[in-house]
Amino acid sequence: MHMFAAFYFVIVLTIEKEWNISYDQLIRLWSLGALLIGLGAIPFGWLSDKWSRSGTMTIMFIGMGLASILCGLSTSVSFLFFSLSLLGLFCSIYHPVGIPWVIHAANKQGRALGVNGIFGGVGIGSGAFVAGTLTELLNWQLAFILPGLISIIIGFILIYLILIDKISYKNYFIKNDDQDHSRNEMILIALIMLLSMFALGLSFHNTQTALPKVFEIRIGNTSSIQIGFMIAIIYFISGATTFVGGLLADRFNLKTIYLIGIFLQFPCYLGIAYISGYSLVVLCILAAVFNASILPTENLLLGKFTPQKYHGVVYGIKFILAFGSGPISVFLISEIYSITLEFTYLFLINAIMMAI
């Protein structure tokens, strides 16, 4: 999912030149897709609760593949907008479905979420690298189409494994350890997490979406492959630290880990706002590491304070906040770039959110 959601941010740099349309106009085409990654989370989470998590995942793989192929076949702005929106809708399936799938299939939940996070980081990083490489060696159309075909194949492999009972069609649940919490405690935790999930989601989208263009501007003389490679390194490393974050979540106080991880992002974004050259890449790595390492903690906190039977819907709500901030991010990036031709104010916004 992360791989497919990351393709356009690199590919758009080539489309900008081929179609002779400005970056701020083209990046807006992702607005509805970014919104649907959030809005699709609740209905697909509900579907997985009522039907089957593994079955819903097959819809994701096949749907993402078809949508990505349509993106590659686009010859107009309107059709590309439609295809990207469809891609965002199918990308919305993973988090409200996949996270509960992982949690309920594991004994050490923090460790399991950490391993899952490694692949999330690899997906983001490889998405940029694959898109940059295929665009440079072949063309931007095949950068969408080839991964789309692979995703469809994976979807049918998953269907086959379900049919032969290698993967369960039914939903698993861990031993019931739902806890009773006071109303005031639940409200306080909910408010804090709502604010933090939105802020973390917006800062993540701001960074992931703008980074290819930021590197093009501030590092200079970089090809699509080089930009994709640098972004791949950033998210490969951050994905690995998600595993470390999962181990910490199994051993230490969840609230403490969460607060420290948020605060440490503040100086990173402050530096990113002003620094150029390869030092910028180092700061981006640190920001991504601190952002990714607290994700297992966040998911465990959310699961701890909500009933298991509603986890699909609950995680759907979470990802509406986290990914529903995507259109706001696209708007900010488009407006800030069109006015300043830079992204300093974008990363200052990130820093302020982490400080608050």
Regions found by a protein language model. Name each.
Residues 83-121:
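Cytoplasmic helix-loop-helix junction between adjacent transmembrane helices
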Residues 39-77, 249-252:
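Conserved MFS/SLC helix-loop-helix module at the cytosolic interface between two early adjacent transmembrane helices
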Residues 252-301:
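C-terminal transmembrane helical hairpin of 12-TM major facilitator-type secondary transporters
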